[in-house]
């Protein structure tokens, strides 16, 4: 039954998600093209520096390409955010609105229903995350004229606290991407839990309550991890490196716990507490 529910969820998600993914890819490719064009115009401006008019025009064109590249980068980021909003609102609509009455009459356990929605949502979020990582890598290659080491550095920054102890190599890049995928699971799980708690507690403005819960819970978790991370940086170099590694593992465990616990608690609340009447 889990497989059937998962397939049904994917059929409902894939068309809107494909449009958002296409926007992300097109924006990323155009942005990379603008970066390459900026470099070409800058070189041309160097040759034309003896001619005031040509140099001024080249300078203006460089600004245009830079702004276009920044706008394309914003579109990539906005597409990534949009897919999470789409996932969350579909979960809310199919569980806690009038459509939820029909959903909850299905002859399946609430845990199976929520799990199917989570895995479909996580698959989409993971796909968008990987595409965003690939576009960021290509953009960095364009900016640095093919310097692969800088790509490794950028990807390793996705590793959270582990980025402070990594050497920017392949292993750090893999850890960074893996942490980004774990963060995607955390985001989906926490969103589902926040929406469920909002539907349970709030009589009105349930979505607003869910947003407040999501921000509040996420802020508390980030604050606690930040405090632990700062405390871990007290000591000699060897101790700090080890402790930051511990904090990195702790961060991953917490994110996975929030993802799994959010799904489990959401399923329990849907079954036992949420009243759609």
Q: Model features per residue range: what roles?
A:
Residues 1-100, 110-277:
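Hydrophobic alpha-helical transmembrane segments of membrane proteins
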């Amino acid at each position: 039954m889990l497989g059937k529910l998962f397939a049904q969820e994917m059929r409902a998600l894939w068309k809107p998600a494909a449009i958002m993914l296409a926007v992300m890819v097109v924006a990323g490719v155009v942005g990379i093209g603008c970066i390459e064009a900026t470099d070409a115009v800058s070189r041309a401006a160097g040759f034309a520096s003896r001619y005031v008019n040509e140099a001024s025009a080249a300078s203006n064109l460089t600004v245009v390409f830079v702004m276009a590249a920044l706008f394309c980068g914003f579109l990539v980021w906005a597409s990534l955010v949009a897919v999470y909003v789409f996932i969350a609102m579909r979960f809310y609509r199919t569980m806690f609105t009038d459509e939820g009455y029909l959903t909850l009459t299905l002859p399946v356990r609430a845990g199976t229903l929520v799990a199917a929605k989570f895995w479909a949502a996580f698959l989409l979020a993971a796909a968008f995350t990987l595409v965003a990582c690939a576009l960021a890598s290509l953009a960095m290659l364009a900016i640095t004229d093919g310097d692969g080491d800088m790509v490794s550095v950028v990807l390793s920054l996705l590793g959270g606290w582990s980025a402070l102890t990594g050497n920017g190599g392949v292993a750090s890049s893999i850890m960074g991407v893996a942490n980004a995928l774990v963060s995607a699971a955390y985001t989906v799980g926490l969103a589902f839990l926040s929406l469920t708690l909002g539907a349970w507690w709030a009589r009105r403005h349930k979505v607003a309550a869910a947003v407040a819960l999501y921000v509040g819970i996420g802020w508390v978790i980030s604050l606690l991890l930040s405090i632990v991370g700062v405390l871990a940086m007290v000591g000699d170099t060897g101790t700090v490196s080890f402790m930051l590694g511990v904090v990195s593992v702790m961060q991953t465990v917490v994110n996975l716990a929030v993802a799994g616990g959010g799904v489990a608690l959401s399923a329990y609340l849907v079954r036992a507490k949420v009243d759609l009447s």
